[in-house]
Amino acid sequence: VYAVGVSNSLCKDKKLFEKDKKRLYDFSNKINKNKVLLYFSTCALNDPSRNQNPYIKNKLEIENFIKKSFAKYLIIRLPEIVGKSNNSNTLINFFFKRIREKEVFDLWVNARRSVIDIDDVTKILIDLLSNKKHENRTINIANPKKYSIDYIVSIIEDLTVLKAEYNLVNKGETNWEIDISQIVNSIKNCKIKFNKNYLKNVLKKYFI
């Protein structure tokens, strides 16, 4: 399992990205390349509005390196993960912090995000790993529903009983999809229900 890297998707520091790649290169020289390498990437690679983002470019370069360098691999692309984390750079943590501290933030009007519970990611991943047919694939583990940013913020406002203060910014991309066809059976096997209350229940679980 290789689960290290730049944690801030807004990072633009080239030195950090070079360090990230060097770490993987060094790691690849120390392990048996016939073993399956599990790497966590990002579903944001599917979002055309972010294809020039340095963080996204770095993820793509690493994915390509893995595909060329390892005989066996499984690349898991993840959306916005919700769980117990002190990383203030994650989208949900960012919104909760800004709203609770009554700080103004920019709200991207056109942006859409898939949000999933880390526990559900774990369940789906375990189910996938039990099937070796998934070796040498790139798989999205995501909630099929993409929520608008203003909807996510409205749920947080409802849960915290606080009013968010933000500036509307005409950014983001609405017309992009996350292909979850490779995890449909796993979702059924794990009995995960991405229903209309999913987002609110997940946010309540970790933040309220």
Could you describe each region identified by the protein language model?
Residues T90, R113-I116, P144-Y147, I178, ...:
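Residue-level signal for the nucleotide or nucleotide-sugar donor/cofactor binding architecture
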Residues V1-K22, N29, C43-S49:
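NAD(P)H-binding glycine-rich loop region in Rossmannoid oxidoreductase-like domains
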Residues L24-I56, L74-R77:
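Conserved Rossmann-fold NAD(P)-dependent oxidoreductase catalytic core, especially the SDR/UDP-sugar
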Residues N64-R113, I118-T122:
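NAD(P)-dependent short-chain dehydrogenase/reductase
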Residues D119-S130, K200, K204:
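Amphipathic alpha-helical segments that line or abut small-molecule/effector binding pockets
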Residues K193-I208:
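Amphipathic terminal alpha-helices
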Residues F17-E18, Q52-E63, N89, S114-V115, ...:
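Short-chain dehydrogenase/reductase
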Residues N131-I180:
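Mid/C-terminal beta-alpha module of Rossmann-like enzyme folds, strongest
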